[in-house]
Amino acid sequence: MNTFCHSTIAARIETAAAAIILFLTTLTSCGRSSSPEPLDQWNDGTSTLHTADPVIAEGRKLFNDKEYQNFRLTGEALTQPGSEAGLLFHTDGESGYEVIFRNGDIDGTRKSGSLASVRNLYRSLAKDGEWFDFEITVRGQNIIVCINGTEVVCYTEPGYPYRTEEHARQLLSQGSIALQGIHGEVSFRNLAIERLA
């Protein structure tokens, strides 16, 4: 038996296996520039709150001090009957986009996952009184919103989007993440954000 032939084949197999592992590692981290980190520092204008599980009451607004452009934000939310909150991104308090958190019966109000004034949803995939998962991904001109693992919004901002005067600054750029209470009280937990390339 020719041992040279077997050792050459073994070396080639080992090299090919290493290349495949490198390829798969690169593939699974494609577009990621960091691993998820807790979104746990908020400012309400008077004090700083350190929690990845904020509760947002009507009229309250919390800002994260960091700036984000391309990201994947995950977490869980809990609404009560009649409660509503918004999660804003690429915001300075006036600009950017807002994802709505509100559940309940079909009654003409925007439901969880709505990209406010752009893609409004009127049927909820989650229930009041039960925690539900959400994910918001922004990359380039694309916004994807998922509720309980189901994609509910896939929006690509055009070069010159139509906007009413009220929403003229609702554009992708970069900015902070904010939570705002609209009605009642909405709880969030396990908020985490991952910067994307």
Regions found by a protein language model. Name each.
Residues 30-197:
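Carbohydrate-interacting regions of secretory-pathway proteins
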Residues 16-26:
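Bacterial N-terminal signal peptides
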Residues 3-17:
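Bacterial N-terminal signal peptides that target proteins for export
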Residues 7-10, 26, 32:
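Intrinsically disordered, low-complexity serine/threonine-rich segments
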